[in-house]
Design a protein with these regions (language model features):
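Rossmann-like adenosine-cofactor binding region
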Residues: 57-64, 176-272
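Rossmann-like dinucleotide-binding domain for NAD(H)/NADP(H)
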Residues: 91, 95-96, 219, 227-347
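An N-terminal-biased, well-structured beta-alpha scaffold segment characteristic
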Residues: 1-96, 218
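Residues in the short beta-alpha loop(s) of Rossmann-like NAD(P)-binding domains
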Residues: 14, 177, 493
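NAD(P)-dependent dehydrogenase/reductase Rossmann-like domain
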Residues: 288-533
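Short beta->alpha connector loops at strand-helix junctions that form conserved
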Residues: 33-34, 54, 76-77, 92-104, ...
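Phosphate-binding beta-alpha-beta segment of Rossmann-like dinucleotide-binding domains, i.e.
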Residues: 91, 98-147, 155, 159-162, ...
């Protein structure tokens, strides 16, 4: 009797070359169908071991629950927004993606938009299609010898920089998390953001959308730019404030703009940018090339094949690559690791050069790579220009010029096991140390930099440095209470009576900028920071 075949459902017009890779394996049965609505997927998926999608089909909790045989979901592309990763993890389903497969296509598209914008190519083409021969209305500008400003020097930003240098442009970049040595290797000058705004003739954005980058290129930024600047957004809608861009175009501050991504997709018919002839717009085509789609199709097909045949995991976004016995030992540390990395990233200096992950006690005696990878993921996820997962975290860090170091260290005080994360650039650094109190469900941050604290690694952490004086805690409590922000726990760590101190508060909700400003008004409070874990 022949062995039961693994059944693979392939949707969303994944590259035929990718389908060929899987079809070549005689133990696989491949079913190829067009994109499905979730109700259709729920009805279809029950008999399959693997699912391969691009971005059209939404793989939600209901579909995953309806697939008792499902072992792996492959996303032919980078983002996994259309897959309920939490639901997949709960059901023991591995989710894989293809990081990096779209890099060249997106960089080339952004560069094409720059050239089209500079030479008025779309407008001249439209004029010709209307039967005109107008050589006067479409005078452009050269990009040779112009200054380019790149916001975000990750994979795509780096590829854009290489092409710009080949065209004779001077290249500036702002990226707090790319090292100076990495920038030098690309022949790029690293500058502060305001300096980039002031000096650049062309500005292109290649950052992820986050709270920090939302509306990063907005009214204040446009006010700092030189008259006649040109702006490109091929990254994420929302990084460029589109209403502010429309005003800057109307006022003549911005000469032209090119966008492939928008705050709302598709943008409404009355979107203000549609009214400007000097604006080039495309419908989110950054990754839409035959080569990119073929590349990600083959890459995900090979990953699915290897997993189903041997259990080998490539580019998983929701599981560490580790044997079952070790996983049982390290499981409590995995979530803690990601949160420590995330916390340190919010305290660290710009352009970190070294990220050290140190272990003490029994945890240091096992394979700690999965823990370290989650530290790096947590550190990078808010600031890198790509989707970071435990598999690509190390490669992403290397691309940013960040050196990752694992250490085994002596015990800290009476703690039998610790995990310590430290980020450093030159003499500037930030550090968090954590352990478990009694059981695996009771983690605690026990040190921040050189100060002993006791804080739960979850939610919102309010930190401030102060002089040890009476009334400070009352000052903070009054302000937070007035704004209906509850304090869950608090630690005050001082060097000596009346000396420097650091206070850490776990809060039930995030304080606004207004609240932080009120807190910082106390004359003996030197700085205030919010860390979201």
């Amino acid at each position: 009797m022949s062995a039961k075949k693994s059944r693979i459902l392939v949707l969303d017009h994944v590259s035929p070359r990718g389908v060929e890779v899987m079809s070549a394996e005689p133990s696989f049965e491949i079913v190829v169908k067009p994109p499905m609505k979730e109700t259709e997927l729920v009805a279809e998926i029950s008999g399959f071991d693997a699912l391969v999608v691009r971005s059209q089909t939404k793989v939600g909790r209901a579909a995953i629950a309806a697939a008792p045989r499902l072992k792996v979901i492959g996303r032919a592309g980078v983002g996994v927004d259309n897959v309920d990763v939490d639901a997949a993890t709960e059901r023991g389903v591995i989710v894989m993606n293809t990081p990096g497969g779209n890099t060249i296509s997106t960089a080339e598209h952004a560069f094409s938009l720059m050239l089209s914008m500079a030479r008025c190519i779309p407008q001249a083409h439209a004029s010709m299609r209307d039967g005109k021969w107008d050589r006067k209305s479409f005078t452009g500008v050269e990009i040779y010898n112009k200054t380019l400003g790149i916001i975000g020097l990750g994979r795509i930003g780096s590829e854009f920089a290489r092409r710009a240098i080949a065209f004779g442009m001077r290249v500036l970049a702002h990226d707090p998390f790319t090292s100076l040595s990495r920038a030098r290797s690309l022949q790029v000058e690293m500058v502060e953001l305001d300096d980039l705004f002031a000096r650049a003739d062309v500005i292109t954005v290649h950052m992820p959308l986050s709270e920090r980058t939302k509306a990063m290129v907005g009214r204040d930024a446009f006010a700092k730019m030189k008259k006649g600047v040109r702006v490109i957004n091929c990254a994420r809608g929302g990084i460029v404030d589109e209403a502010a861009l429309a005003d800057a175009l109307r006022e003549g501050k911005v000469a032209a703009a090119a966008l492939d991504v928008f705050e709302q997709e598709p943008p409404p018919a009355d979107h203000p940018l549609r009214a400007f002839p000097q604006v080039v717009m495309t419908p989110h085509l950054g990754a839409s090339t035959n080569e990119a789609q073929e590349s990600v199709g083959i890459e995900i097909a090979e990953a699915i094949r290897d997993f189903l045949l041997s259990g080998e995991v490539h580019n998983a976004v929701n599981v560490p690559n580790v044997d079952a016995r070790t996983l049982a030992v390290i499981r409590p540390w995995l979530r803690l690791a990601e949160r420590l990395g995330r916390g340190v990233s919010q305290l660290a200096p710009d352009r970190v050069e070294d990220l050290a992950v140190s272990y003490s006690g029994a945890i240091g005696e096992v394979n700690t790579q999965p823990i370290t990878r989650l530290v790096v993921k947590g550190f990078l996820e808010r600031i890198s220009g790509c989707d970071v997962n435990p598999v690509n975290a190390m490669v992403t860090a290397a691309a940013l010029g960040i050196r990752i170091v694992e250490n085994r260290v002596c015990a800290l005080g009476s703690y039998s096991e610790i995990l310590q994360v430290s980020a450093q650039r030159g003499k500037d650094s930030a550090c968090m140390t954590a352990t478990f109190f009694g059981s695996a469900d009771n983690p605690r941050i026990v040190r921040i930099n050189d100060r002993t604290v006791e804080a739960a690694p979850e939610g919102v952490l309010l930190l401030f440095a102060n002089d040890d004086r009476p009334g400070i805690i009352g000052h903070i409590g009054t302000i937070l209470g007035h704004h209906k922000i509850n304090i869950a726990s608090m630690t005050l760590s001082r060097e000596k009576l009346g000396g420097p101190a650091v206070t850490a508060l776990n809060l039930d909700s995030e304080p606004s900028a207004e609240v932080l400003k009120e807190v910082s008004t106390h004359p003996t409070i030197h700085w205030v920071k919010v860390v979201k874990l």
